[in-house]
Amino acid sequence: MSVKELLIQNVHKEEHSHAHNKITVVGVGAVGMACAISILMKDLADELALVDVIEDKLRGEMLDLQHGSLFLRTPKIVSGKDYSVTAHSKLVIITAGARQQEGESRLNLVQRNVNIFKFIIPNVVKHSPDCTLLVVSNPVDILTYVAWKISGFPKHRVIGSGCNLDSARFRYLMGGKLGIHSLSCHGWIIGEHGDSSVPVWSGVNVAGVSLKALYPDLGTDADKEHWKEVHKQVVDSAYEVIKLKGYTSWAIGLSVADLAETIMRNLRRVHPISTMVKGMYGIHDDVFLSVPCVLGYSGITDVVKMTLKSEEEEKLRKSADTLWGIQKELQF
């Protein structure tokens, strides 16, 4: 008899059923691994699968995480180049793609990443036809559209990480300005994740007190306190981090884990994430932009209708036009 047989008496032969709360991360670069560790630390999955094309790096990352199993509560961590390892995932997070170079705009990355998605998405769909897709790769709004088109999934199951991080950065900077923790600072950034994002100044508040009502110049050119700079810093922050360390990873990883938690635990929290906005705010094309969405186990169930100023709506429409201009040129 083996040591195992001497030690353990079997009571019930388990059926080999698949995981119930499986999460896949596609792409094990800095962002993918930051997402993976953040998800593991939150105990959101009973199985985590990693996929990439670089096999040595992939296996190394898997082993490194497995060796930390004692300190985690995710019993199974797997990886492979073949998408069969992703089978039966509830949530698939796409971080793979060409990386943004210093000074390169997110929109410049597009066609490089479309070609990568043409390989990834059909493989994901084949093995997890009922999953929710969470796109993180940039430019995220366009690539969420691309993932939606290629996958054939209903729009509520294809989500872009969008402005969840932009809004978090905004609240962090707002907290710094006011000397209050960012959790108590409320403000929403919507629209494109990137250079043309829209800060909704009318909704910025602490404890329900509107800053715009207190100080009508907030966010305008007449503002002596330069709150507009806070939004500019949000837009510039990724470029600054990329310039200093070569890429961004931790904040986006934490932001994605925040979204994963809402989905896997069916929390129905409201997040500014990228969804199909056709028919909203006078937008007529198939574009994905961030608006406040109710998120849960089945993806996006509802959208909160924000009261926007005419110039804010105009900015959203302008973003939509820019994105559509690029999307209609894409080769699928």
UniProtKB/Swiss-Prot annotation:
Pathway: Fermentation; pyruvate fermentation to lactate; (S)-lactate from pyruvate: step 1/1. It comes from the Eukaryota. Coiled coil: none annotated. Signal peptide: none annotated. Its EC number is 1.1.1.27. Disulfide bonds: none annotated. It holds the Pfam family Ldh_1_C. NAD(+) binds at residues 29-57, 99, 138. Keywords: Cytoplasm, NAD, Oxidoreductase. It is found in: Cytoplasm. It catalyses: (S)-lactate + NAD(+) = pyruvate + NADH + H(+). Substrate binds at R106, N138, R169, T248. One of its GO terms (biological process) is lactate metabolic process. PROSITE patterns: L_LDH. InterPro entries: L-lactate/malate_DH, L-lactate_DH, L-lactate_DH_AS, Lactate/malate_DH_C, Lactate/malate_DH_N, Lactate_DH/Glyco_Ohase_4_C, NAD(P)-bd_dom_sf. It is an enzyme of class 1 (oxidoreductase). GO terms for cellular component: cytoplasm. The active site is at H193. Its main location: cytoplasm. GO terms for molecular function: L-lactate dehydrogenase activity. SUPFAM superfamilies: LDH C-terminal domain-like, NAD(P)-binding Rossmann-fold domains. Homotetramer. Interconverts simultaneously and stereospecifically pyruvate and lactate with concomitant interconversion of NADH and NAD(+). Belongs to the LDH/MDH superfamily. LDH family. This is L-lactate dehydrogenase A chain. It comes from Trachemys scripta elegans (Red-eared slider turtle). The gene is LDHA.
